[in-house]
Design a protein with these regions (language model features):
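Auxiliary Fe-S-binding modules of radical SAM enzymes
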Residues: 1-88, 242-251, 256-342
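Short linear Ser/Thr-Pro motifs
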Residues: 72, 106-107, 120, 190, ...
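A generic beta-sheet turn/junction motif
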Residues: 73, 85, 96-98, 193, ...
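A short loop-to-beta-strand scaffold at the N-terminal edge of the catalytic core in hydrolase folds
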Residues: 89-94
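Canonical Radical SAM [4Fe-4S] cluster-binding loop centered on the CxxxCxxC motif
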Residues: 96-133
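Conserved alpha-helical substructure of the radical SAM core
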Residues: 121-151
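Conserved AdoMet/S-adenosylmethionine-binding subsite of the radical SAM
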Residues: 142-151, 156-319
Length: 342
């Protein structure tokens, strides 16, 4: 079975090339080609034909193909359905902002978390993505769209911290000066609240932004919509977040979906304010996007504004997320891993 060359760091690639009798500078040439979008060794024109044939016999550099591309008529958001080498599919989204272009990528095929308001978890987890498959979503989204990517959010299909090792390697690859060279401060990683992995991430002391999907400040309602809360209740999760902030100095963003009758009461706003006090936290409020299977509904505009006002009155920074790509089901919680019948 051929090795996945694009999942290797430059140092690993240099060692692999040395093991087959090739100089290190060749590895750097290949690394650069791969991270510029080369999909075959034949495209690497500064390599000899014999070396290209040799590498092709040893390594797999198969790129994903575009199974479907949708462009929002509302705001130009682009959603890609990528077909992977094994036939599985994942989605990623390119969003245009005044401050630059952001790509939202998936970390797994399917998702193990079971959140009731999210389409990505329907059907459960199939497999974790390889580092190369994360890189390719960023790279080929940029190449196909023609929009230079300046920011990455790991908020697509899957739980990034459930795929911890591969995601950490992806971060190293995407941050490499010889690769796409996207700075850590331009990367956001979202988690549903895997406390053990948050603790592990804190030890890495990375300069990325950690986004925690909270969605409720009380265990009763959070457990109903997020099964992970039964293992790591709200207070346990927030203790890990405080420790993360203390170790890294990086402010945490809390994702908070506004769900009618579930997470939007004034009492919950007061409780959330109390539990986040002193953390320098930012609350990113998200109107629930439609997922037919969930049976849940977004909060009223009045409830959303009242909730936000209570947070701000208590000294908690809160913003309302702008919804992009809603006409192509590209908004938060709407990504799926396969074609939908129409």
């Amino acid at each position: 079975m051929k090795q996945d060359l694009k999942s290797m760091t430059l140092a690993e690639m240099q060692d692999a090339f040395a093991a087959i009798g090739e100089p290190k500078f060749r590895a750097k040439q290949v690394f650069t080609w791969l991270h510029r979008g080369a999909v075959s060794f034949d495209a690497m024109t500064n390599l000899s034909k014999s070396l290209r044939e040799k590498l092709d016999g040893l390594y797999d550099i198969t790129a994903p193909s575009v199974a479907r591309k949708q462009v929002s008529k509302l705001d130009g958001t682009i959603k890609y359905l990528w077909k992977l080498r094994d036939g599985n599919c994942v989605e990623s989204v390119v969003m245009q902002y005044h401050h630059g272009n952001t790509v939202c990528i998936s970390s797994e095929v399917g998702c193990p978390m079971g959140c009731k308001f999210c389409a990505s978890t329907i059907g459960g987890l199939v497999r974790r993505l390889e580092p190369s498959e994360l890189v390719d979503q960023v790279l080929f989204s940029q190449l196909d769209s023609g929009l230079p990517v300046s920011n990455i959010v790991l908020m697509g299909i899957g739980e990034p911290l459930d795929n911890f090792d591969n995601v950490m390697r992806f971060l190293e690859l995407i941050n490499s000066p010889d690769g796409m060279n996207i700075g850590m401060r331009h990367i956001s990683l979202s988690t549903g609240g895997l406390v053990d992995k948050i603790e592990k991430l804190a030890e890495r002391d990375l300069q990325l932004t950690l986004s925690v999907s909270l969605h409720s400040p009380d265990d009763e309602s959070r457990s109903k919509i997020m099964p992970v809360n039964r293992r790591w209740p709200v207070d346990t999760l927030l203790a890990a977040c405080r420790d993360y902030f203390a170790k890294t100095g990086r402010r945490i963003s809390f994702e908070y979906t506004m769900i009618d009758g579930v997470s939007d009461s004034p009492e919950q706003a007061e409780l959330l304010s109390k539990k986040l006090a002193g953390m320098g936290a930012h609350v990113n409020m998200i109107p629930l996007n439609n997922v037919t299977e969930s049976g849940l509904h977004t909060s009223s505009r009045q409830a959303i504004h009242q909730f936000q006002s209570i947070l701000e009155a208590n000294g908690i920074t809160a913003t309302l997320r702008r919804t992009l790509g809603s006409d192509i089901d590209a908004s938060c919680g709407q990504l799926r891993r396969k074609y939908e019948k129409t």
